[in-house]
Curated annotation (Swiss-Prot):
Source organism: Brucella abortus (strain 2308)
GO CC list: cytosol
Phylogenetic placement of the source organism: Bacteria, Pseudomonadati, Pseudomonadota, Alphaproteobacteria, Hyphomicrobiales
Gene: trmD
Pfam families the UniProt entry points to: tRNA_m1G_MT
Keywords: Cytoplasm, Methyltransferase, S-adenosyl-L-methionine, Transferase, tRNA processing
Family, per entry: Belongs to the RNA methyltransferase TrmD family.
Protein name, UniProt field: tRNA (guanine-N(1)-)-methyltransferase
Amino acid sequence: MTDLPEKEGGRFHASVLTLYPEMFPGPLGISLAGKALAEGKWQLDTVQIRDFAEGRHRMVDDTPSGGGAGMVMKADVVARALDSVDDGRPMLLMTPRGKPLTQERVRALADGAGAIILCGRFEGVDERVIEGRNLEEISIGDYILSGGETAAIVLLDAVVRLLPGVMGNRESGETESFETGLLEHPHYTRPQEWEGRAIPDILTSGNHGAIDKWRLEQAERITRERRPDLWEAYCKNRRKIGGQ
């Protein structure tokens, strides 16, 4: 097993394999991610999968063995594309059948040298290349998109904002939803009153201990009501820490 590569100049390097390279950087070229990209805090390149197809028609897909609807991305073509950029970075396949993307996985990727991201299309990718290249299958939710490009953008946006120097306030990232195991507490800003609704008095009291307590209580309430799965995991972790 080879050692994972170190970050080149400290930069996270993303290589996206796609049939639609024109979709990148897309939203990753603006706001936090775009500024960080322009400043060289991370690197993005795309690989056109069709460049690795052979024959006059440069076919990247074929009919599914055993019959069925749609087309399947060819193992040989995809493998050549992957091999062209393989340097030990994790290889990810964006697919609805993958493991759900979590903030924990996002943090792990942000701490690494980068990722090679394969964007699926059609009915999917030949299983043999998934096994042969040890692709990690990742899903961003229980719904179907036209392709993996949008999912790759979501993943990269989540990763890039955690890279050093990208977010101005480190605390902002550490207190967001999922970072603490809870959904985030409510936020307010001026004016003090809007359409008869006032900012909770506790937030303007200047008592930071009381404010922290209120925010935790609100985060716990929202998580308990909206994400019982997260609430159960949070409670389990608290019991573990408490030695109960």
